[in-house]
């Protein structure tokens, strides 16, 4: 086991804070409408230019192991915020840095770290409750477009195209983002169905850059049982090999010899194939397989209705224009089922939903209806160069996540104003001692940090702007885009409540852990000079003369 280096107390905290600052300072320059770009070096190809906080955070690794631990913990904040709400990563990083910086100062001054953490936690709980009170529903197209615009760095075209997509396929509809061929963004709405099952083996992946499987004009085999014996699939595979078309297998499971053979055939290019598990469980799985069959014009191979997999032919298979499979979900686009049958199936599900007494069943039936009747909207991102395309695509994806979050939990005033208002409205949070009270103050002070950073990035003095906003009421705030003050909602500067809430909760959670850190352990750094001595062994070549 390698020797370890151990740091205690203030030595550990100073190193950790240095790492936090390196990562946070790199990320926070991107915040706000006048945030700057960060250029990331890539081992091959052109460098990546981005304003996406989590993309910057993921690139940072520090040489000093103790500083790196601090940086990695803040990276976790950005990743968690991104996973939960798909946006707000920079806000979360700025909040975490502010809480850690103030918290470690208080610890150095002799305050109890555990009480500070409890105070911070109490303030955050109160703040989240107050955020819910401030939140307003985001239902109309205009509000959705404004949220998308803000998240896409004040690019109105992106906000509008997302709002249009949501209008076309419904708020529950499926919206995907692709790289387009034109200079402008385009919106395509395609009939399709998505379900939450990914590929059964990563060896099916044929688009390594996105980690997905894409099948063009595939046959779709639907089986209501586990498939483990490859003999059952041979007649279908032989028929397919003659057509040269790909195959998607949707079954209860595909395992053992069957899965291994499919993977080998796919890798050798004999048959293009991918397999996914059928969505749902029990009776719901049977119903969803039937939905897919009607959508694609296929038949579900089920022994209970006298159909055996070995006797299945190509006529029993469904077809679609395209299928996209990621590790988490499968999207069937443009199924070739009969329109009349699809409408009849939707009407049947609608009747079931109306008759159902269970809220859960009702929700699931409505979900199935949306998947059958709704479509898939594809936003094709247009740009002049590949570098710009990648940067723009990341912004569109961020904006899409933000609008979904806004529809889910509503919106609050943007530009860091909501957190400032929340901090001023939280009255006396109940605390047990002075250290906890200081923890509350740390959290409330940190809630001003995003506003200060937005102002700083816009070339203004953060403290002056924060003071002006604090003196206002309601949605009064600072519009960094055009350097004016006014009602943020009227100016169309909105943040999804979910994004702001997630950023605050994750930042305080990780910051609390860092404040209560007393010891850090890392491998001792091996001295490069010692390792270099091995080079002398090259002289051993002379031993050839001994023969």
From Swiss-Prot:
<dbReference type="GO" id="GO:0005737">
    <property type="term" value="C:cytoplasm"/>
</dbReference>
<keyword id="KW-0547">Nucleotide-binding</keyword>
<dbReference type="GO" id="GO:0042026">
    <property type="term" value="P:protein refolding"/>
</dbReference>
<dbReference type="InterPro" id="IPR027409">
    <property type="entry name" value="GroEL-like_apical_dom_sf"/>
</dbReference>
<feature type="binding site">
    <location>
        <position position="495"/>
    </location>
    <ligand>
        <name>ATP</name>
    </ligand>
</feature>
<dbReference type="InterPro" id="IPR001844">
    <property type="entry name" value="Cpn60/GroEL"/>
</dbReference>
<dbReference type="InterPro" id="IPR027410">
    <property type="entry name" value="TCP-1-like_intermed_sf"/>
</dbReference>
<feature type="binding site">
    <location>
        <begin position="30"/>
        <end position="33"/>
    </location>
    <ligand>
        <name>ATP</name>
    </ligand>
</feature>
<keyword id="KW-0143">Chaperone</keyword>
<dbReference type="InterPro" id="IPR002423">
    <property type="entry name" value="Cpn60/GroEL/TCP-1"/>
</dbReference>
<comment type="similarity">
    <text>Belongs to the chaperonin (HSP60) family.</text>
</comment>
<dbReference type="GO" id="GO:0140662">
    <property type="term" value="F:ATP-dependent protein folding chaperone"/>
</dbReference>
<feature type="binding site">
    <location>
        <position position="51"/>
    </location>
    <ligand>
        <name>ATP</name>
    </ligand>
</feature>
<comment type="subunit">
    <text>Forms a cylinder of 14 subunits composed of two heptameric rings stacked back-to-back. Interacts with the co-chaperonin GroES.</text>
</comment>
<protein>
    <recommendedName>
        <fullName>Chaperonin GroEL</fullName>
        <ecNumber>5.6.1.7</ecNumber>
    </recommendedName>
</protein>
<dbReference type="GO" id="GO:0051082">
    <property type="term" value="F:unfolded protein binding"/>
</dbReference>
<dbReference type="Pfam" id="PF00118">
    <property type="entry name" value="Cpn60_TCP1"/>
</dbReference>
<comment type="function">
    <text>Together with its co-chaperonin GroES, plays an essential role in assisting protein folding. The GroEL-GroES system forms a nano-cage that allows encapsulation of the non-native substrate proteins and provides a physical environment optimized to promote and accelerate protein folding.</text>
</comment>
<dbReference type="InterPro" id="IPR018370">
    <property type="entry name" value="Chaperonin_Cpn60_CS"/>
</dbReference>
<keyword id="KW-0067">ATP-binding</keyword>
<keyword id="KW-0413">Isomerase</keyword>
<dbReference type="GO" id="GO:0016853">
    <property type="term" value="F:isomerase activity"/>
</dbReference>
<dbReference type="InterPro" id="IPR027413">
    <property type="entry name" value="GROEL-like_equatorial_sf"/>
</dbReference>
<feature type="binding site">
    <location>
        <begin position="87"/>
        <end position="91"/>
    </location>
    <ligand>
        <name>ATP</name>
    </ligand>
</feature>
<dbReference type="GO" id="GO:0005524">
    <property type="term" value="F:ATP binding"/>
</dbReference>
<keyword id="KW-0963">Cytoplasm</keyword>
<feature type="binding site">
    <location>
        <position position="415"/>
    </location>
    <ligand>
        <name>ATP</name>
    </ligand>
</feature>
């Amino acid at each position: 086991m390698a020797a370890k280096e151990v740091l205690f107390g203030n030595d550990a905290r100073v190193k950790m804070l240095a790492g936090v600052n390196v990562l946070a300072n790199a990320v926070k320059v991107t915040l706000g409408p006048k945030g700057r770009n960060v250029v990331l070096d890539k081992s091959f190809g052109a460098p990546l230019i981005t304003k996406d906080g989590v993309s910057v955070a993921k690139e940072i690794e520090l040489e000093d192991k103790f500083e790196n631990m601090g940086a990695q913990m803040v990276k976790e904040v950005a990743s968690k915020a991104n996973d939960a709400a798909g946006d707000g990563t920079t806000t979360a990083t700025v909040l975490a840095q502010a809480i850690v910086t103030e918290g470690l100062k208080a610890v150095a001054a002799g305050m109890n770290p555990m009480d500070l953490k409890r105070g911070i936690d109490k303030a955050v709980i109160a703040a989240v409750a107050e955020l819910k009170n401030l939140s307003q529903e985001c239902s109309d197209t205009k509000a959705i477009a404004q949220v998308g615009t803000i998240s896409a760095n004040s690019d109105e075209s992106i906000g509008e195209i997302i709002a249009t997509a949501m209008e076309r396929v419904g708020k529950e509809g499926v919206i995907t983002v692709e790289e387009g061929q034109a200079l402008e963004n385009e919106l395509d709405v395609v009939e399709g169905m998505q379900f939450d099952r990914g590929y059964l083996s990563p060896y099916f992946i044929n688009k390594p850059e996105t980690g997905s499987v894409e099948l063009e004009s595939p046959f779709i085999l639907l089986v209501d049982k586990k498939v483990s014996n490859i003999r059952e699939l041979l007649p279908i595979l032989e028929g397919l090999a003659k057509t040269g078309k790909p195959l998607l297998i949707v079954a209860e499971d595909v395992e053992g010899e069957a899965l291994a053979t499919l993977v080998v055939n796919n890798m050798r290019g004999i048959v293009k194939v991918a397999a996914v598990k059928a969505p749902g469980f029990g009776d719901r799985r049977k119903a969803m397989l039937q939905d897919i069959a009607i959508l694609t014009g296929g038949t579900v191979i089920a022994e209970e209705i006298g159909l055996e997999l070995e006797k299945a032919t190509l006529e029993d298979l469904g077809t679609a224009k395209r299928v996209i499979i990621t590790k988490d979900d499968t999207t069937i686009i443009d199924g070739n089922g009969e329109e009349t049958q699809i409408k009849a199936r939707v009407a049947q599900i609608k009747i079931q939903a109306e008759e159902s007494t269970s809220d859960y069943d009702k929700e699931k039936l409505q979900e199935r209806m949306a998947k059958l009747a709704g479509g898939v909207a594809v936003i094709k991102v247009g740009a002049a160069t590949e570098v710009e395309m990648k940067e723009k695509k990341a912004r569109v994806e961020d904006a899409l996540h933000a609008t979904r979050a806004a529809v889910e939990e509503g919106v609050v005033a943007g530009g860091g104003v909501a957190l400032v208002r929340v901090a001023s409205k939280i009255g006396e949070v109940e605390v047990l001692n002075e250290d906890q009270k200081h923890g509350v103050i740390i959290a409330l002070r940190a809630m001003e940090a995003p506003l200060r950073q937005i102002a700083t990035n816009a070339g203004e003095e953060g403290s002056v702007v924060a003071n002006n906003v604090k003196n206002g009421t309601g949605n009064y705030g600072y519009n960094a885009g055009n350097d004016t003050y006014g009602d943020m909602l009227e100016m169309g500067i909105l943040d999804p409540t979910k994004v702001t809430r997630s950023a605050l909760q994750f930042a305080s959670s990780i910051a609390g852990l860092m404040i209560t850190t007393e010891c850090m352990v890392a491998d001792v750094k091996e001295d490069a000079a010692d390792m270099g001595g091995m080079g002398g062994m090259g002289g051993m070549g002379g031993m050839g003369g001994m023969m």
